Amino acid sequence: MSTPSGFIQFNPVQLSATVPENTSPLREACTTLAAYDLHTSYTGTDLIGSNGNVSVRRTSGFVVTATQLPSKHNLAPEDCVHLETCVDGDARFHGAKLPSSESIMHWHLFETFPDIQAIVHVHESNALLYSEPNRTRWAELGIVESAQDIGGGTIEVGRATAEAFTTESSYVILKNHRPDWDPGRTGTVVIHRTLEEAVNSALKIHEALKQ
């Protein structure tokens, strides 16, 4: 199992090829978010993949979507990975595919906020996020932006994202977190105590920004 060069900024260590069980809710959440154009497939690049990822806490570690999935519509069980531990840059996992390139961010958020059970990372339209009328509503909607630019795939991303959460109910914009081939969208993150709440929070902001 090879690591995509420059894409995953940590060392994935496969403990087994066992596919995690009971992932239907997570996979259905991805289908829902993709239907709202929040988990878009890559275009304008030779890379295969789609924006965003979703994770759910388990007794040890968490289950997260795999990396470089062409689409997040109707994912299969093998499109999910159980990340068991993350120590010194080694992400130890069970699954048939490599874990999401943002797994380190998810790990740090779960460690920082022990009460949360789910994390939703989407890429929202810049036209919605940064329009002048909508920027004046950020405080009202609970939207905050990270203080620093946030790239991808490193523990620093996790730390900077965690610091941006003023409350667990915040909707955090990851400043300048956008790939070169998709400059019209920026990554955002919500955390919650249930997967349903996390998905609903992302969709609620999406719909509010369209008003």
Segments the model singles out, each with a brief description of its role:
Residues 1-211:
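Glycine-rich flexible loops
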